């Protein structure tokens, strides 16, 4: 009787981990392209770490030299301009993928895997923190004033706020000490993100992926490789194609022109605003006339994602077969787009009023509308079960 050779990827202590994650992983056969964004986020993180390391080799974290060192990277370092453009626009692609990933999670009820969802929300918050401290590093006008305005919000905390701000700044204003520590945070956080990503994947593999039907995935599963590995590679090609097109043809389209001006503490820009992917949260912050209230609203705008698993009242997992919930979901997306636009507008009438309405709608959808609709749709399904036919007049 001949001895069957063992496959090393299945028996090796280290390779077997990769095998169970990327090769022999049982995956639902019917997952759509919306399930691609997790792997795209991994690609974005790897790309950001590689380009970031190359940039860090030439960057100088000093208020006198930071701006010049970024110019030096673009002008004198071989392909430095490309690394800088890929890193800056890679952040935008990162957040596009994050928002698509979160949107898919809300639509298809992925948040019911509570551990995976909670780690994901922490990942989102850490990514936002990483992007914020990174935006300060070029030491342009918007870098300096963005850092000043956003960090100064912490002073709204009762009793300890002012002390925390001075401690964070390393002085009584945003200075060289602030830039040095922000560079340190920006360097270390992506590696923490990578570790958290492994925890995120570990929790996901405890339950397995959900699927577009919202039913038990164990009925029909196939191995990850070659089916979904090739599907992911197609996503990689599309993402990299878009990223390179932006980086080569319109590298500054998503940036802020004021950041090409050296930071000047004596001259405030006409409109202080963050990068486009934070504008919705910035709009919510500005919608509250009270400083502390604005900070609470800003934190709540992201942390509200943590309550979704507990406000889920529907008998169905996702929104695939729930017309009312679908309409509300797309109203939420439109509301976020409106908040993003409003965040870039001046803080004056009518924009402030529009922002307050849009912010109220945002919170109401999560806290009230989704739970109430879940309850109503349960009642409608019960009625249709008793009568033998679905009463569409109750839906539309």
UniProtKB/Swiss-Prot annotation:
Protein localization: Mitochondrion inner membrane
Keyword Cell inner membrane in annotation: no
GO CC entries: mitochondrial inner membrane; respiratory chain complex III
Alphabetized InterPro entries for the sequence: Cyt_b/b6_C (IPR005798), Cyt_b/b6_C_sf (IPR036150), Cyt_b/b6_N (IPR005797), Cytb/b6-like_sf (IPR027387), Cytochrome_b (IPR030689), Cytochrome_b_C_euk/bac (IPR048260), Cytochrome_b_N_euk/bac (IPR048259), Di-haem_cyt_TM (IPR016174)
Leftover remarks: Heme 1 (or BL or b562) is low-potential and absorbs at about 562 nm, and heme 2 (or BH or b566) is high-potential and absorbs at about 566 nm.
Annotated function: Component of the ubiquinol-cytochrome c reductase complex (complex III or cytochrome b-c1 complex) that is part of the mitochondrial respiratory chain. The b-c1 complex mediates electron transfer from ubiquinol to cytochrome c. Contributes to the generation of a proton gradient across the mitochondrial membrane that is then used for ATP synthesis.
Protein name per its UniProtKB record: Cytochrome b
Species per Swiss-Prot/TrEMBL record: Petromyzon marinus
Record gene name: mt-cyb
């Amino acid at each position: 009787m001949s001895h069957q050779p063992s496959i090393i990827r299945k028996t090796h202590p280290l390779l077997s981990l990769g095998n169970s994650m990327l090769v022999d992983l049982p995956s639902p056969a019917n997952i759509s392209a919306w399930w691609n964004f997790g792997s795209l986020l991994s690609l974005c993180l790897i790309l950001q770490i590689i380009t970031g390391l190359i940039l860090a080799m030439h960057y100088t974290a000093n208020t006198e030299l930071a701006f010049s060192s970024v110019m030096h990277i673009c002008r004198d370092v071989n392909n430095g301009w490309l690394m800088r453009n890929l890193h800056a626009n890679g952040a935008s692609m990162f957040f596009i993928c994050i928002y698509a990933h979160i949107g898919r999670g809300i639509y298809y009820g992925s948040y019911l895997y509570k551990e995976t969802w909670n780690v994901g929300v922490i990942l989102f918050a850490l990514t936002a923190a990483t992007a914020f401290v990174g935006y300060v590093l070029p030491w342009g006008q918007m870098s300096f004033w963005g850092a000043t305005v956003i960090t100064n919000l912490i002073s709204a905390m009762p009793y300890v706020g002012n002390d925390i701000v001075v401690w964070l700044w390393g002085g009584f204003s945003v200075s060289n000490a602030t830039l040095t520590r922000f560079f340190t945070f920006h360097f270390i956080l992506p590696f923490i993100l990578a570790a958290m990503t492994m925890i995120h994947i570990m929790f996901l593999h405890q339950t397995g992926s959900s699927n577009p039907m919202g039913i038990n995935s164990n009925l029909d599963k196939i191995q990850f490789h070659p089916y979904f590995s090739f599907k992911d590679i197609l996503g990689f090609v599309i993402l990299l194609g878009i990223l390179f097109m932006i980086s080569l043809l319109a590298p500054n389209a998503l940036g802020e022109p004021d950041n090409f001006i050296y930071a000047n503490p004596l001259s405030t820009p006409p409109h202080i605003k963050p990068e486009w992917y934070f504008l919705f949260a910035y709009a919510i912050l500005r919608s509250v006339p009270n400083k502390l209230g604005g900070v609470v609203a800003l934190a709540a705008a992201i942390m509200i994602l943590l309550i979704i698993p507990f406000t889920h009242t529907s008998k169905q997992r996702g929104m695939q077969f729930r017309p009312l919930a679908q309409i509300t979901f797309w109203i939420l997306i439109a509301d976020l787009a409106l908040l993003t636009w409003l965040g870039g507008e001046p803080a004056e009438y009518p924009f402030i009023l529009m922002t307050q309405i849009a912010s109220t709608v945002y919170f109401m959808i999560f806290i009230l509308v989704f739970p109430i609709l879940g309850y109503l749709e349960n009642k409608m399904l019960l009625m249709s079960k008793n009568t033998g036919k679905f009463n569409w007049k109750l839906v539309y």
